[in-house]
Amino acid sequence: MIAPDATLSDCRLADGVLVINLDHRPERMAQFEKMARPLGLFQGWQRIAAVNGVDIPGYGKPPWFRNGKRDKCWAGRAGCTLSHRKAIEHARDMGWSSVLILEDDIQLGAGFETSARDFLNRTAACADTWGACFLGLSKQVGPSRKLIDLDNARATYEIFGCIGAFAYILKRESFDWILANLPSPESVWTWISRHRAIDRWYARNLSRRCVVHAVSPNLIGHYSSFSDIGQRAGANLVIEDCGSNSHDPLRDCGKTAFVMRCRLLRGRFQLARIANELRGALKRIRGL
């Protein structure tokens, strides 16, 4: 447990902190560096050079591409997926027991330092053995149940899944399984045609392997800037934003209801795999 008089320079959210950043987005890296400099819990962070989707073999060529309007969107999704894979591979190769993976456009929520300290203290005391924890999310997928109240009106929840992979912690036990299920550059277009995006795949599959937690409202959000995935400015997801772009806070459904709803949703997504396979085959014929 962190001593009451300790500073955040005495603690870290994970063994390693990795920031995914495209080479042609240095302004994002500069903004992250400015934000992270005074924060000890980001100390020793490392940059992961993101994969630019338009440079992946097969981009812009049949069968997957036929000069469609959304070609660059699909390239962004593929590059994002391979970038997260690259970060997890790095964490595994470093021998870390946990890794905090951040995208370069993150923004800290109000009362971040207080909530981060409380999160570390209470997570250390939590009996649940979790494998992944999302410090921010864009959209909830499935049920959630409250585990621990944190300072500043936040809480830690167990969740089925969520959309949003801009700030999350993975434990070492999940590394190999995730890497075995994420695509390589050679298979990424087939994978994307079926699963669309890494956060969608996480939302539907990660809780099959490990217990998934999330902090809500967001401990870490992200600011609005041009997205290489969406090819437009994204939503501003920070705790101060109470408008329509802010994610709805998670709600406790109770342990029994949580277990039952997770089983039902898992069965539904298992059936959806057939639809995913068919959609992938169709996109190979028509293009992404």
Task: Name each region found by the language model.
Residues 1-102, 106-288:
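An acidic/histidine-cluster motif and surrounding catalytic segment
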